[in-house]
Every structure is written in structure tokens, then in C-alpha cells.
Curated annotation (Swiss-Prot):
A motif (DEGH box) lies at residues 410-413. It comes from Schizosaccharomyces pombe (strain 972 / ATCC 24843) (Fission yeast). The keyword Zinc applies. SMART domains: DEXDc, HELICc. This is DNA repair protein rhp54. Its EC number is 3.6.4.12.
Length: 852
């Protein structure tokens, strides 16, 4: 072919180009113009050539979709020949075949092997679970308890392996069941009133059941007919085989925090286990309350803190607490003490309590309470609310809608009156778990005991009228010394029946347990004779026309007369003699000036009172011969004024705590007195203001100067020094004016304690010493006796005023079992202060109790 020269290049068609190529390579053209297409490769640049070779072989995926099947094996780059075999290359080929979804879901994910040189990273991340990728199921962790129940010193409150039958119920479910039952009863009563045909029976329930069943059958037929015309579509969970409702996780053990387990004593461990069983409903599904009635000094506070901490942190469901919030209510003097106890036993940063101490304004307090009541879950930063009974009663309306996990009532005998405002207000709180702390659940009568039980577990003993009819009246008749033998048998039967019901929800231990952990305690009831001046004033008053009116039943102020007699027994300076006792001027001793006429001369004359003279001698001997400290307690602040004058006149440094002191300052005052480096010698304490819950272990001697009508108040006051932390032997003295109204009060206390020991302590051998008729003789003076109380005992160990047989076994609540010493035999008593009173006129008789 000859090309003609032209000025313009002619346009050549595509077909002509193809013919030209074929003509040049005619010898290489096959029979068919069909050859597998191969993508042209890009030109490798110089920079590309300088890069290092690939570490992993290249894989050819071209066999997918091939026809001739010549490319079944993987393509391996020549540059890495020898580094990977055909078998290894084939393993890298991806499989695009369709797989069964169930197989994909069930297949376990395997973590890729670590890169060479980075094995340490895999070791660091070994504790982490593999990442969730694609269709992998969620990792199900094995439920585990918060603390190891298999530890050597572990204290297990709930063990799923042994307590599996005792399933802890959910309070919400129990309440729902109660509501359903109540609604069912209401519906049945309504049907009965409307129908008025047949009495209520099982037939009514059967009819209602059949009606409901027929309605449900018709509804199911309608649903089935309509469902025939619908496509039976399945949900994604059904298609993937995912369960709609997972089975509940297995329960885990509940274990006391090891830091608390190390310090709990055996009786305290028993107490915590009892409390946990009660509040979790393992004793009775419908009763979640209980009473901790241990005597003072056994560690009720620590036991309740262990319970509270366990409920806030653990439950049989792993990772979930039993409760979110709790309230601690107590006397105002103990609010700060409870906060300190939480820090003492749990640690500084373990828990942050919400303390209502009166420092905030009313509006700020209301806002804080509303916020505390509304938060839930992780928003709860202050789970424990601590408030006094009065404060909680005032602001209870702002907590009515709050879900409170537990209510803990310290010194719970404040709830002894079910008609009081405090009882009514606290009973409105939305809380089922109620724990009452009271070392003296029976203070005056069984009605108060019923109030405490009814608050802890409402409805357990029926209504108050039912309790009084079924239990209180028969038991009191059986305890009366004038009762018949039949009354005693009936009372014992009712007492056993009541104890069977109540003992499931009350735990009571006596101070005898403390003998293992505390020093010896000597407790004495010291009967002191009146001075000549006191005796004349006492006789003058009980023979006055005012007392005669009271004895005839026409007097209008018997309580005032009782108060005047008690003040005469303490010291004449407590009275305004010219006004309170008309015509007593002739009885004044030579040189005596009444208190209201002395002016600034306020020095006290101890010789005018038998009890005050004994007190002055004791203080002097303690100060001169020992380094002990002493606590002086009285029911009257005016008596504390006399103590203060006496200490000031003798140069004794004294601290005073009464109802006038700010609550925030009380704990600082107690800490100052307990500090051994401080030089305070006497602590003056009002039993009304600080007789409950205050620890005065800095002193090892205590004098209760006058008795209270309520034996619980005296028992609380007497327990201030013999407590945990005490290092010295303790000496406790109770002063009683011989033959006076104070001895009548003491006898009445003995009767109440005898009743308490029968109901609470289950003591069967407490003798019926007193008749109720004898206890009404309050305005009589027996000035010819050394101890009227001892005469009522008919003690077989004493003859002619002397004890020939020492007490074989002393019961703390029964002074008839104590050692008895009259004044001539005081030289044989262990106490060196009382031993020196032998031969003197002031002390007539002493009852002695020794702890161990």
C-alpha cells in the first residue's frame, strides 16, 4: 500500500485500524478472536520501586465467576515467592457463599493474633473481654457477690446454697398482693350488699370466675378469627432465635463488709443476722419490722449501722442494693452522735449523711428535703437522712411521696403513745422496713409495748382494744399479788401466747454479755435517811389540809404535791418555803435563812439534806484519793444548780449539760469531758436532756440523785459510763430517801421491771412482790424503818437486819436477788466510799449488784 502525500491528515476509521493490526500479526491470531480480558497494569514509578516489598502475599480473586476454571489456585507474587505457600494463600480466600443465619450468630468470635513485636499489648488487655463485633451476642457475666462468702472471716447473711427456700420477697409485690386482696374483699362486700340473696361463699367467687373465663374465651375467639386474615409475621427476635424474656440471674450471697466483720462481737453478729431476716421478710412476708431491745451498752448502734450499710450496698441480685435511701430518727441530742458513729465505723468517705441539725433556714430545708425525696438510683448522693423526732415530725409532709427503704428509730420508746403527733406523723411515711431501738420497750404498761409493736409491724396484734382484751388485762391480773391462782394460770397462758407471736420480731439480750468485754461494774441502791430539818418539813406537809384534800379525793393538784415532796427529799433549798409550805417558819433551825431571802449569798448547806451530805463526802474522797471522774444526774435542773454551787464552793471543775444547751454544742462538751488530758472532774447531767445515748466513758463513777417514775429513764441514765471503751471498774450509786415517796417510786419501778422481765426477758421466776393497792400509798411516811422495800421482799437470806447468805446469783432487774447491807454491816462491802459510811446516820441500807 502506497500512501499519497497530502497536506491534511486523513481520518482513519476504527475498522481499518483493526484490519491493519490483524494483517501485521496474522501469524499470531488464533482461530477464534476470544481471549480472557486482562486489565492493563499501571506503570510503576521510580518512587514505587523504592518502597519495601509487601510482607503479605497478594491474592488473586479472579477465579470467582471464571469459566474455564484455570485460576482455581491463588496468585502469589513472584517477589514474595517462598514466603507463603499455596495452602496458606488458599486460607486467606474470603468465602462469599450464603450461610445459615443461626450458624453465624452462634459462632464464637476469636480475637486476632497479636502483631509481632506487640505481644505486651495483648498481655495488658488480657483481663478485658473481647470486643463485640457484628452479630456477636452480648457477654453474660457470672453474677458474683460483693464480698467473698468463702473467706475465713466472712459473715454471710444470705447464702443461696442453704437459704434457697427462703426467697426474699419484693416489698412492692407484697404490697400489690395486699391491695388485690383488699379490692377483692371490697368487691365481695359490694356484691353481697347489692344481691342480698345468699350469704357470701365460694359460689360467688366461682360465678365471678366463670364470668371472667367466658369473657376471655369470647375475646380469644374474636382474636383468632381476625388473625386468620393476617399474615403470621414474626418479629426479628423470633427470626433470630433471641429469647424475649431472659431467665432471672441466680441469687448471690450477701456478706457483711469485712471492715465491720472484724469488729463485730458474737452477740452483735447474731443481732445483725436477726435484723436482716426481719427487714427482708424471711420471717414473715407481710412483716418487715422488728425491735432491737438489747439493754444499754451492747452495741445497738453498731449492729444497726452494719445492717444499714449492707442494705445500701448489697442484695441477692448481684450489683443491686436492697434499699436506696434510709432515715434515722433519734432524740435531738443524738443527731450529731449518729453522724459521728457512721464515720467511726464506716470510714470518713464511705457515706455522706444528710443531717438536719437546724443550721439551715426553713425554706432551704424544705427544698433540700424535696430534692432528697425525689432522687433515685445513681442520683442519690446522700442516702441516709438523720433527724430528730421533732424535726422529722415538722417536715414529714415533704417526705410523704418518697420511697424510703428503711426507717430506724433510736430510743424508740418515744413512740410509746400511738395517739401522739410523733407516732401519727412517722406512721404516714412510705416505708415498710421499720427498726425500733429501745433498751426498755416496756416502760409503764403493756399498752405502750403494743404501740411499739404496732408501729414496727402494723396489724400484727390486731387493734388496741383487741390487744387489751386478749393479752393486757389477763397478764396484769396474773401479775397482781392479790390475784387468784386461776388468774395466774390464765395470765401465764396469755403471756406464753403473746411471747410466741412477738419473739419472732424482737431480740433482747441483757448486760450480762458485757461481762466478757468490760471491767467489773458495782451498782448500789443507797437508802439515805432524811435530816432532822427535812423530816420536820416532810411531816408538816403530809399533814397539811392540802394533802388531806388529795387523800379524800377532793384535791385538784396531786402532781404538784408529789413534786414538792420529791424536792424536800433532795434539799430544802429547792423550795420557796414561805410560799410552798405555809406555817413552816417555826421549823427552821437556828440561823437558817430561806433561799428567797439570802440575796447573793447562795452557798449551799449540805447538812440540811441527808443525800447531799453523803454526796459531799463522796466527792471529797474521790478527788483526794483517786484520779476518777464522776457524773451527777438529776431529774431537776434546780438540783443541778445546787450541784454547781457545791462544786464551785469546793473548787471542783464541772461541766453541765441540760435542756437549755444547743444541740450542736452537746457533743463537743461530751468530747471535752471524755478527754483524759482535760481536768474536768464532775459532769452535771439532766436525765431529761441527755440521759439517752450519750457516752461518758471518761468517768467511771456515777450518782443518780433522785428516781424517776419511769424506770426506763433511770436505766438509761445509769448506763452512761459502763459502755464500750471503758477501761476502769465502774461504781454506780442510786440515792433513795428512806421511807419517803422516793422509796414508793422505787417500789413501783421494781413492779414495772418485773413486768418487763416477764414479757420481754421471759423470766418465769420473778416473784409478785407488790400489790397495786399498796403502791397507792404515796403520801405516807415511814420514819421507823431502815428500808421499807427490803421488808416487802420477805428476804430469806437476811435475819435481824443482817445478811447471812450472800446472793448466789444476782439478776440485774430484780433487786431482791442482790446483796443487802444495813448500816452496821457496811464494813463488809467492797466499795470503800460506802464502807466509810458505816456508823454514820445518813446511810441506812445498801443493795449491791456486781456484774461479774
Amino acid at each position: 500500500m502506497i500512501q499519497q502525500p497530502t497536506t491534511a491528515k486523513p481520518r482513519i476509521s476504527t475498522s481499518s485500524k483493526l484490519n491493519t493490526v490483524l494483517s501485521k500479526n496474522k501469524e499470531n491470531v488464533p482461530g477464534k478472536l476470544f481471549k480472557k480480558f486482562k486489565c492493563p497494569s499501571l506503570v510503576i514509578s521510580e518512587k514505587r520501586k523504592e518502597l519495601p516489598l509487601r510482607k503479605k502475599p497478594r491474592v488473586n480473586y479472579s477465579e470467582y465467576g471464571s469459566v474455564d476454571g484455570k485460576y482455581d489456585s491463588a496468585y502469589v507474587s513472584e517477589n514474595v515467592s517462598g514466603l507463603a505457600t499455596i495452602k496458606e494463600a488458599n486460607r486467606l480466600i474470603l468465602n462469599h457463599e450464603r450461610r445459615d443465619p443461626s450458624t453465624v450468630i452462634k459462632k464464637q468470635f476469636s480475637v486476632p493474633k497479636p502483631i509481632k513485636g506487640h505481644e505486651d499489648i495483648s498481655k495488658l488487655c488480657a483481663h478485658r473481654p473481647p470486643p463485640t463485633l457484628g452479630m456477636k451476642r452480648k457477654v453474660d457475666f457470672i453474677p458474683r457477690p460483693l464480698y467473698d462468702p468463702a473467706d475465713e472471716f466472712a459473715i454471710v447473711l444470705y447464702d443461696p446454697t442453704t437459704d434457697a427456700d427462703e426467697i426474699i420477697p419484693d416489698i412492692k409485690e407484697v404490697l400489690a398482693e395486699k391491695r388485690k386482696k383488699d379490692e377483692l374483699l371490697k368487691n365481695r362486700k359490694g356484691k353481697k350488699e347489692i344481691s342480698d340473696s345468699e350469704p357470701e361463699s365460694d359460689h360467688d367467687s366461682c360465678v365471678s370466675t366463670d364470668t371472667v373465663a367466658s369473657c376471655s374465651t369470647e375475646q380469644s375467639l374474636i382474636t383468632s378469627n381476625t388473625s386468620k386474615h393476617r399474615r403470621p409475621n414474626k418479629s426479628l427476635k423470633d427470626l433470630l432465635g433471641i429469647q424475649k424474656e431472659k431467665p432471672p440471674p441466680p441469687p448471690v450471697a450477701v456478706v457483711i463488709d469485712p471492715k465491720l466483720a472484724r469488729i463485730l462481737r458474737p452477740h452483735q453478729i447474731e443481732g445483725v443476722k436477726f435484723l436482716y431476716k426481719c427487714v427482708t421478710g424471711r420471717i414473715d412476708r407481710c412483716a418487715n419490722g422488728c425491735i432491737m431491745a438489747d439493754e444499754m451498752g451492747l452495741g445497738k448502734t453498731l449492729q444497726c449501722i452494719a445492717l444499714l450499710w449492707t442494705l445500701l450496698k448489697q442484695s441477692p441480685q448481684a450489683g443491686k442494693p436492697t434499699i436506696e435511701k434510709a432515715i434515722i430518727t433519734c432524740p435531738s441530742s443524738l443527731v450529731k452522735n449518729w453522724a459521728n458513729e457512721l464515720v467511726k465505723w464506716l470510714g470518713k468517705d464511705a457515706i455522706t449523711p444528710f443531717i438536719l441539725d437546724g443550721k439551715s433556714s426553713k425554706q432551704e430545708l424544705i427544698m433540700a428535703l424535696q430534692q432528697w425525696a425525689s432522687v433515685h438510683g445513681r442520683q442519690v448522693t446522700r442516702p441516709v437522712l438523720i433527724a430528730s423526732y421533732e424535726t422529722l415530725r415538722s417536715y414529714v409532709e415533704h417526705l410523704n411521696n418518697a420511697e424510703i427503704g428503711m426507717l430506724l428509730c433510736d430510743e424508740g420508746h418515744r413512740l410509746k403513745n400511738s395517739d401522739s403527733l410523733t407516732f401519727t406523723a412517722l406512721d404516714k411515711l412510705n416505708v415498710q422496713r421499720r427498726v425500733i431501738l429501745s433498751g426498755t420497750p416496756i416502760q409503764n404498761d403493756l399498752s405502750e409495748y403494743f404501740s411499739l409493736l404496732n408501729f414496727a409491724n402494723p396489724g400484727l396484734l390486731g387493734s388496741r382494744q383487741e390487744f387489751r382484751k386478749n393479752y393486757e388485762i389477763p397478764i396484769l391480773k396474773g401479775r397482781d399479788a392479790d390475784g387468784t391462782e386461776k388468774d395466774k394460770e390464765n395470765g401465764d397462758a396469755k403471756l406464753a401466747e403473746l411471747a410466741k407471736i412477738v419473739n419472732r420480731f424482737i431480740i433482747r439480750r441483757t448486760n450480762d454479755i458485757l461481762s466478757k468485754y468490760l471491767p467489773v461494774k458495782y451498782e448500789h441502791v443507797v437508802f439515805c435517811n432524811l435530816s432532822e430539818f427535812q423530816l420536820s418539813l416532810y411531816k408538816h406537809f403530809i399533814t397539811s389540809p392540802e394533802i388531806n384534800k388529795i387523800l379524800r379525793g377532793t384535791g385538784s393538784q396531786p402532781l404538784k404535791a408529789i413534786g414538792l415532796l420529791k424536792k424536800i427529799c433532795n434539799h430544802p433549798d429547792l423550795l420557796n418555803l414561805t410560799e410552798d409550805l405555809e406555817g413552816c417558819e417555826a421549823l427552821f433551825p437556828p440561823g437558817f435563812i430561806p433561799r428567797e431571802l439570802r440575796g447573793r449569798d447562795r452557798n449551799i448547806d449540805s447538812s440540811l439534806s441527808g443525800k447531799m451530805l453523803v454526796l459531799e463526802r463522796m466527792l471529797y474522797q474521790i478527788k483526794q484519793e483517786t484520779d476518777d471522774k464522776i457524773v451527777l444526774i438529776s431529774n431537776y435542773t434546780s438540783t443541778l444548780d445546787l450541784f454547781e454551787q457545791l462544786c464551785r464552793a469546793r473548787g471542783y471543775k464541772a461541766l453541765r449539760l441540760d435542756g437549755t444547751m444547743n444541740v450542736n454544742k452537746r457533743q463537743r462538751l461530751v468530747d471535752t469531758f471524755n478527754d483524759p488530758e482535760k481536768d474536768a472532774f464532775v459532769f452535771l447531767l439532766s436525765s431529761k436532756a441527755g440521759g439517752c445515748g450519750i457516752n461518758l466513758i471518761g468517768a467511771n463513777r456515777l450518782i443518780l440523785f433522785d428516781p424517776d417514775w419511769n424506770p426506763a429513764a433511770d436505766q438509761q441514765a445509769l448506763a452512761r459510763v459502763w459502755r464500750d471503751g471503758q477501761k476502769k471498774d465502774c461504781f454506780v450509786y442510786r440515792f433513795i430517801a428512806t421511807g419517803t415517796i422516793e422509796e414508793k417510786i422505787f417500789q413501783r419501778q421494781s413492779h414495772k421491771q418485773s413486768l418487763s422481765s416477764c414479757v420481754v426477758d421471759e423470766a418465769q421466776d420473778v416473784e409478785r412482790h407488790f400489790s397495786l393497792d399498796n403502791l397507792r400509798q404515796l403520801f405516807q411516811l415511814n420514819d421507823h424503818t431502815v428500808c421499807e422495800t427490803h421488808e416487802t421482799y420477805k428476804c430469806k437470806r437476811c435475819r435481824d437486819g443482817k445478811q447471812f447468805i450472800r446472793a448466789p446469783a444476782m439478776l440485774y432487774g430484780d433487786t431482791s436477788t442482790w446483796n443487802h447491807f444495813t448500816n452496821p454491816t457496811l464494813d463488809r462491802i467492797e466499795d470503800h466510799l460506802l464502807k466509810r459510811e458505816a456508823g454514820k446516820q445518813q446511810v441506812s441500807t445498801v443493795f449491791q449488784y456486781k456484774s461479774h
